[in-house]
Regions:
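Ser/Thr/Gly/Pro-rich low-complexity, disordered linker/stalk segments of secreted
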Residues: 1-20
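A short alpha-helix/helix-coil micro-patch that ends at or immediately precedes a cysteine
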Residues: 19-65
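Short, functionally important structural connectors and interaction interfaces within domains
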Residues: 37-39, 43, 87, 111, ...
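Surface-exposed patches in mature extracellular/periplasmic domains of secreted proteins
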Residues: 39-53, 66-77, 116-132
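Short, surface-exposed glycine/acidic/tryptophan-bearing loops
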Residues: 53-100
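Disulfide-stabilized extracellular recognition modules
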Residues: 96-149
Length: 149
């Protein structure tokens, strides 16, 4: 009978750091965005399932191309067609990078005039927020907010 000798094992690699527990809390981001709108006397935005799905798609694209242009070179608005939705007349997209919590990301957007303007648009009623933790060479937090009428 063969002897039961222990064999050498390759040590397990150290696990990569995971995002913080509240990272990517898209509903907290929406709550904070609506709080900023309330402070400005604007109506609350309602969560739209299609916009949530579109935002998830766009957030997942950001590690490949952090831009309002999609990885295939098309404009960000082409995501509407993928969901059978006509591009709304009133719309806006905010992209964010590196913030590990909803609070940090919304604060960052509120401290940027263009992003703040999208949050405080008075002619939009719906919102979707997406988040992606990029696990490529650069581990980063990616956020997308889409608002429409």
């Amino acid at each position: 009978q063969p002897e039961n000798k222990p064999t050498e094992t390759t040590p397990e690699p150290e696990p990569e750091p995971e995002p913080s527990e509240d990272a990517g809390d898209v509903y907290e981001a929406i709550r904070l965005i609506n709080a900023e709108r309330a402070k400005a006397g604007l109506a609350e935005l309602t969560i739209d399932d299609d916009l949530m799905s579109m935002a998830a798609v766009r957030a997942a694209e950001l590690p490949e191309k952090f831009d309002h242009t999609r990885p295939d070179g098309s404009d960000w608005k082409t995501v509407f067609g993928e969901f059978g939705v006509e591009v709304p007349y009133k719309r806006g997209e905010n992209a964010g990078l590196g913030k590990d919590t909803a609070s940090k990301q919304v604060n960052s957007w509120m401290n940027s005039s263009g992003h703040k303007a999208n949050i405080l648009k008075d002619n939009v009623t719906k919102i979707g927020v997406g988040y992606c933790y990029g696990d490529g060479a650069e581990k980063k937090n990616y956020w997308i907010m889409i608002v429409t009428n």
